[in-house]
Structures are given as structure tokens and as C-alpha cells.
UniProtKB/Swiss-Prot annotation:
Native organism: Escherichia phage T5
Lineage of the organism: Viruses, Duplodnaviria, Heunggongvirae, Uroviricota, Caudoviricetes
Catalytic activity: (6S)-5,6,7,8-tetrahydrofolate + NADP(+) = 7,8-dihydrofolate + NADPH + H(+)
Gene3D superfamilies, per the entry: Dihydrofolate Reductase, subunit A
UniProt-recorded name of the protein: Dihydrofolate reductase
EC number of the protein: 1.5.1.3
GO biological process: DNA replication; viral DNA genome replication
Function noted in UniProt: Provides the tetrahydrofolates necessary for the synthesis of nucleotides and amino acids. Bacteriophage T5 induces high levels of dihydrofolate reductase in the host cell, probably for the viral replication.
Length: 177
């Protein structure tokens, strides 16, 4: 089964200068890691830009717990060695059977998610929608096809939360396709 996990603003805000538009949001990250632990994926697929933007400690947490696949159309820095990941240069209409038969989690970025949705590979998703008192600025938005697909699908609320001053809130939903 292939499950996506990602956070997005209410208007598709997804990234800002290689980071999250809302900055660090511990309460949502706790819900994310809790759900990732429950899923206990055999495989993680992640875009190169998303992987490289992760803090070192988060990258280290991914290594060894799951087989790591990085979607990259260019070489990664030399310190990211092939012994810790398998590169994916293209997402097509079919995927290796083991990715579908085992628990596989897709973490983003926006382009990888679009490729996976366009080819019908995503079977479910844990989507955290982030609400902010301030307008969220973004230079990367999740494609409207994904937003529409999520809007029209069955959604079950899994977690809700807010930061200490309530300036950020989230709703994490399981979306089934």
C-alpha cells in the first residue's frame, strides 16, 4: 500500500524558500511522527529537495528504519551516498511490485506528489492542513489537482492541535481514494 504524508496550507501553500511556509510547528510534527511510527513503513519515497531540506537528525532517523528511495533528476551531493538510498530518476505508470505490496510512504515534495497522484499510485494520504493567524506566504503550492482530489475524497479526522499561543492550528486527516 502506498500512503502519502504531507502538510499543506488551506490554499495549497506547501513551501517557502525550501522550508515550510509556517516554519517549525512542533505539535504538528509530533502528530506526523506518531503516524509515521504507526505506519512503520518498509519503504520511504521522498523528493531530493525535500530530503536535502530536512535537518540532519531527521535524515538520520530515516536511515535504516525503512528502505529509502530518493526521486532525483540530478546527482545528489557527495555526502549522500548510494549505500543509504536508491535513486529514482522517473516515476511512470508502473512501480515495482514490492513498493505496492509493502507499506510505502511518500513524503513529498510537491513535484513528487504530483507525479505519484497523476499516475494513480497513491492509495491513501495523511494530510495535515495548517491554519495560521497570519497569511501564509509560499513560493511552492501543491497542485490544484491534488487539492481537488482530496476535497472530493472521504476524509477521516485523525488528529487536531495547536501551538501554545494558538497562532497555528492543524487538522490531520486520513484521505482515502
Amino acid at each position: 500500500m502506498i500512503t502519502a504524508m504531507y502538510a499543506v496550507g488551506p490554499n495549497g501553500e506547501f513551501g517557502l524558500r525550501g522550508k515550510l511556509p509556517w516554519g517549525s510547528f512542533k505539535e504538528e510534527l509530533d502528530a506526523f511522527y506518531s503516524q509515521l511510527d504507526v505506519l512503520n513503513p518498509d519503504n520511504i519515497i521522498i523528493g531530493a529537495g525535500t530530503y536535502l531540506a530536512l535537518p540532519y537528525a531527521v535524515r538520520e532517523r530515516m536511515i535504516g528504519a525503512s528502505d529509502l528511495f530518493i526521486r532525483a533528476d540530478r546527482p545528489l551531493p557527495d555526502d549522500i551516498t548510494h549505500d543509504i538510498y536508491t535513486p529514482i530518476s522517473m516515476i511512470g505508470d508502473t512501480l515495482p511490485t514490492f513498493l505496492k505490496d509493502q507499506q510505502t510512504v511518500v513524503l513529498g515534495g510537491a513535484n513528487l506528489l504530483l507525479e505519484m497522484y497523476q499516475h494513480g499510485h497513491i492509495e491513501s494520504a495523511f494530510v495535515s492542513t495548517i491554519f495560521s493567524e497570519q497569511k501564509l506566504e509560499a513560493d511552492t503550492h501543491l497542485d490544484s489537482m491534488i487539492l481537488d482530489y482530496n476535497y472530493e475524497s472521504t476524509r477521516l479526522v485523525y488528529a487536531v492541535g495547536a501551538n501554545s499561543d494558538n497562532s497555528l492550528r492543524f487538522v490531520q486527516e486520513l484521505v482515502t481514494y
